[in-house]
Amino acid sequence: MGLTYQLIPVLVCLLVCTSHFVHGHKCDITLAEIIKTLNILTTRKNSCMELPVADVFAAPKNTTEKETFCRVGIELRRIYRSHTCLNKFLGGLDRNLNSLASKTCSVNEAKTSTSTLKDLLERLKTIMKEKYSKC
């Protein structure tokens, strides 16, 4: 027996509503995981936290949030691929940021001022907490 014509719009509406709920919930989970990792990293006393990184937040005003997250990911990869400390946390953070970032971006280290890994992570944590409060 086929579906009645009155039932089809109801099912479509339920499908759309469920899809919207799942996507919104994913945002919360990813951001919460990023914030949790950042909390762990920023409380660690580790010499790697003083490593110099490009100040990716000192980008032009027209830089999108996705481009900024992409640039942060590039700096994190540069650190955890060339140093043996904090690889697990930085790698996980990079993977989670990748889901929020644009696929291509560049960091011009010659023109960019430097900061420390700890400063970068602290600023990222502030941004993520603000983003989480709006999600």
UniProtKB/Swiss-Prot annotation:
Disulfide bonds: 27-135, 48-85, 70-105
Pfam families named in the record: IL4 (PF00727)
Residues with glycosylation annotation: 62
Record-level GO BP terms: B cell activation; immune response; interleukin-4-mediated signaling pathway; negative regulation of inflammatory response; positive regulation of DNA-templated transcription; positive regulation of macroautophagy; regulation of immune response
Keyword annotations: B-cell activation, Cytokine, Disulfide bond, Glycoprotein, Growth factor, Secreted, Signal
Residues annotated as transmembrane: none
Residues of the signal peptide: 1-24
Entry's Gene Ontology molecular function annotations: cytokine activity; growth factor activity; interleukin-4 receptor binding
Subcellular localization, as worded in the UniProt entry: Secreted
Any one annotated GO CC term: extracellular space
Cited InterPro entries: 4_helix_cytokine-like_core, IL-4, IL-4/IL-13, IL-4/IL-13_CS
Family label: Belongs to the IL-4/IL-13 family.
Role summary: Participates in at least several B-cell activation processes as well as of other cell types. It is a costimulator of DNA-synthesis. It induces the expression of class II MHC molecules on resting B-cells. It enhances both secretion and cell surface expression of IgE and IgG1. It also regulates the expression of the low affinity Fc receptor for IgE (CD23) on both lymphocytes and monocytes. Positively regulates IL31RA expression in macrophages. Stimulates autophagy in dendritic cells by interfering with mTORC1 signaling and through the induction of RUFY4.
Protein name per the record: Interleukin-4
Lineage, broadest ranks: Eukaryota, Metazoa, Chordata, Craniata, Vertebrata
Gene behind the chain: IL4
